């Protein structure tokens, strides 16, 4: 699910929610057209931090006030945050859930009060969502595992770093990984375990595996870039170089790792683009507009061949990219391809 920002304090506070006016037109009292949309995310990971910037950009251009909360990877905290947003009477709620099988009562409550509640980036197992803006995590897992299988020549030993167990990202990326592994009986999984999307946890997990398996480890498949970067740090500290690592998300450090050769590749899930799309769907629902409520974000593969363009969008020319984000988001909603951003290899419908 992926650089701590100025709102990192929210994550540390867990249950504390912070309303951020992102409309540039004054507060709600000053402008009755302002829409208040509540947001609760699993944690302020690098991915979410980048995504928040995209949502803020879209909100400012569309007279939306965002009320932000981070659940610090705690299901009960997130449930309380959704309850609070419902009680505040926000116009819509966006949830990036901690766990797929959570928030059933909260979703039902929002629906009964006519508040559209959307799951974005990670799924919720409920039929009562007003919107469901999701990445194709199965395809992303298959894509990263195929990269690794190709690099290993279909033979070798790997370890797998998983997201938080029970979250839709972990479940579905794992399904994709397993689909590809089934075609390569000579690739053995030495170990797999969660590092909860976190770089520091992945460092410790990888150190333990290096201690247990040593030179038997031929590759590292990480379900997100942050964990892959943690594995990279542990391998370097152990004096091991050249072990192929693959990740998912295309955060700044992950893209730089692809460019340097420390990663063999990643799958770009540009949080700036994806979360902006989620907000655009929520905004359309609030306004009563026709909109596809379940668009799918298909992540492009990022390798040395196209990483430079991805780095421009995420890092070096980020402000230029943000300046065009609202137009891009609206165009993508029309075409149905919410992941399109002109990366070589992508084709616009």
Swiss-Prot record:
A lipid is attached at residue 23 (N-palmitoyl cysteine). It is a lipid-anchor. GO terms for molecular function: carbohydrate binding. GO terms for biological process: carbohydrate transport; cellular response to carbohydrate stimulus. Xylitol binds at residues 42, 121, 173, 224, 249, 269. InterPro entries: Peripla_BP_I, SBP_2_dom. It is found in: Cell membrane. A lipid is attached at residue 23 (S-diacylglycerol cysteine). CDD domains: PBP1_ABC_ThpA_XypA. Induction: Up-regulated during growth on D-threitol relative to growth on glycerol. Residues 1-22 form the signal peptide. It comes from the Bacteria. Keywords: Cell membrane, Lipoprotein, Membrane, Palmitate, Signal, Sugar transport, Transport. Pfam families: Peripla_BP_4. Belongs to the bacterial solute-binding protein 2 family. Part of an ABC transporter complex likely involved in xylitol import. Binds xylitol. This is Xylitol-binding protein.
């Amino acid at each position: 699910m992926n650089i701590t920002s100025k709102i990192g304090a929210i994550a540390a506070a867990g249950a504390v929610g912070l309303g951020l006016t992102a409309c540039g037109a004054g507060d709600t009292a000053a402008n009755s057209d302002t829409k208040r949309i509540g947001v609760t995310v699993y944690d302020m990971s690098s991915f979410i931090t980048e995504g928040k910037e995209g949502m803020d950009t879209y909100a400012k251009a569309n007279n939306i006030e965002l009320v932000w909360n981070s659940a610090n990877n705690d299901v009960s905290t997130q449930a309380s945050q959704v309850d609070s947003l419902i009680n505040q009477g926000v116009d819509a709620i966006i949830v990036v859930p901690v766990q797929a099988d959570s928030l059933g009562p909260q979703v039902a409550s929002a629906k009964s009060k006519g508040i559209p509640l959307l799951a974005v980036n990670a799924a919720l197992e409920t039929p009562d969502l007003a919107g469901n803006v999701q990445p194709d995590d199965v395809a992303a897992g298959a894509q990263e595992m195929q990269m690794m299988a190709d690099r290993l020549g279909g033979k070798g030993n790997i370890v797998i770093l998983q997201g938080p167990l029970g979250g839709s990202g972990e479940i579905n990326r794992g399904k994709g990984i397993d689909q590809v592994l089934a075609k390569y009986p000579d690739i053995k999984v030495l170990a797999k375990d969660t590092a909860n999307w976190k770089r520091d946890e992945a460092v410790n997990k990888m150190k333990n595996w290096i201690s247990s398996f040593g030179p038997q480890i031929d590759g590292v498949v990480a379900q997100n870039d942050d964990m892959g970067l943690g594995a990279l740090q542990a391998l370097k500290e152990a004096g091991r170089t050249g072990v192929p690592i693959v990740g998912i998300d295309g955060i700044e450090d992950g893209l730089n790792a692809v460019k340097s050769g420390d990663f063999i590749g990643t799958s770009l899930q540009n949080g700036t683009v994806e979360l902006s799309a989620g907000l655009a769907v929520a905004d359309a629902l609030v306004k009563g507009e026709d909109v596809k409520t379940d668009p799918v974000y298909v992540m492009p593969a990022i390798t040395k061949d196209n990483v430079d363009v991805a780095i421009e969008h995420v890092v070096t020319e980020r402000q230029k990219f943000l300046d065009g984000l609202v137009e891009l988001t609206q165009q993508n909603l029309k075409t149905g391809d919410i992941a399109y951003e002109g990366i070589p290899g992508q084709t616009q419908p």
